[in-house]
């Protein structure tokens, strides 16, 4: 099965930042859209719950929400926007500013690609 553009973008993110061990892209309801690599069972549901809770508690005026949480096994990073959320897992030594920068870069690329595709599909042949 061919990889989707979202899966390819997440694979690129893993190449861009060697600190990221896993990346998930979720829709606005918190359902899994794409992952790289395939997440362990149950992790996508937990990420979706985190995304929904972050939106309910912290979203203000459509601004993206950024959360990072450190635990013994590593760090969880979340960016939630009105359209999508991205969750990444890293080792504890990762620098949050760099991880968020790379995550935002890939989310921006995905948004541009979606806009270009919408224009392409919406264009009528002359």
PLM features: what roles do these ranges have?
Residues 1-22, 28-126:
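Acidic, low-complexity cytosolic segments
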């Amino acid at each position: 099965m061919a990889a989707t553009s979202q899966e390819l973008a997440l694979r690129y993110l893993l190449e861009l930042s060697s600190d990221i061990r896993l990346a998930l892209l979720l829709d606005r309801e918190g359902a899994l859209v794409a992952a790289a690599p395939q997440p362990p069972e149950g992790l996508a549901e937990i990420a979706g719950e985190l995304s929904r809770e972050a939106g309910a508690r912290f979203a203000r005026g459509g601004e993206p929400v950024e959360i990072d949480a450190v635990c013994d096994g590593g760090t969880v990073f979340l960016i939630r926007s009105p359209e999508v959320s991205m969750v990444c897992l890293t080792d504890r030594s990762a620098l949050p500013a760099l991880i968020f920068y790379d995550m935002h870069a890939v989310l921006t690329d995905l948004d541009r690609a979606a806009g270009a595709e919408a224009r392409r599909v919406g264009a009528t042949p002359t």
